[in-house]
Amino acid sequence: MQRRSFLKHSGMAGILAAGSAPAFAQGAPTIKWRCASSFPKSLDTIYGAAETAAKTVSDITGGKFQIQVFAAGEIVPGLQVADAVQNGTVECGHTAPYYYIGKDPTFAFGTAIPFGLNQRQFDAWWFFGGGKELYNEFLKDYGITSILCGNTGAQMGGWYRKEIKTVADLKGLKMRIGGFAGQVLAKLGVVPQQLAGGDIYPALEKGTIDAAEWVGPYDDEKLGFNKVAKYYYYPGWWEGGPALHYFCNSAKYNELPAEYKAALHAGCQDGNTWMMAKYDAQNPAALRKLVAGGTQLRPFPKAVMDACYKAAMERYAEESAKNPKWKKIYDNYVAFQKEQILWFRVCENTYDNFMATAGATGAAKK
């Protein structure tokens, strides 16, 4: 990528056009925002993306634009961040948009839908496939402006007290699962529960729920799920590349000077890259530790995957038939995904599959 193109999409173009970072000190206003996170501080990666973005914003502006991040519950509960942004309680929030599908299922596209885009594909759709424009158009009714800031990559399929051998094993299962996936699994008999990250462990421990999904090995081990559930399934087909965002109050965002907006976008881009890189760096060792401690790693049976895929497609057809806002984004999203699958199947998947086999047989060892 040429340097000019990179700077444009990283949010730095406006800053460089203005001169340089020290220019902020010459009569620039001091602006302080509060950011409500949906996540606890103990989850240093998913919470840390918001702090990384805030630090970058401060560094770029010479401390003139400061964003203070508050953990879930310090200002509002984790699942009420969008409301706090919308009503002006805080200027911005770092959250997973699919938490708010109760308002409209279309919110899910900001994070992930079952059998959707992976992390790289999501970023491509967001920046170059019309995703950013379509999603922010949808958010206008809520007075929110969204800036991409984080991704976990493909997630694990969750923790279960019993094995999932057939589709029938899903019936009656009380499971903590966020976003649109709960509606899909409900078609197969699962009883979905929406809980914030910090509330999952006690619910599993007390038996209030039978299963729970969160992110992946690094976070899951920190939260101690392996102590209260034995079976760890993969893949998390509902979250192939779930994204996090800075939800900004649109009125406050629009008041920002152009240079501060550019700094905010650059900061979020920094947080986006930092979060994905840290998860990729930390997950392998965490998975090894979990398995060494007795966790039983299991793939979902193909029959279960097939049934879930069928249920997801049915649910999408239902929503498209009755929700124009959903359909507008869904049609664009699916068309983009089809092209991505073609490309990944030709090159990316071929390479990854070969390396997985080569690594297993020792061919990749020195």
Language-model features: locations:
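N-terminal secretory/targeting leader peptides
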Residues: Q2-G19, F24-F122, G130, L134-K366
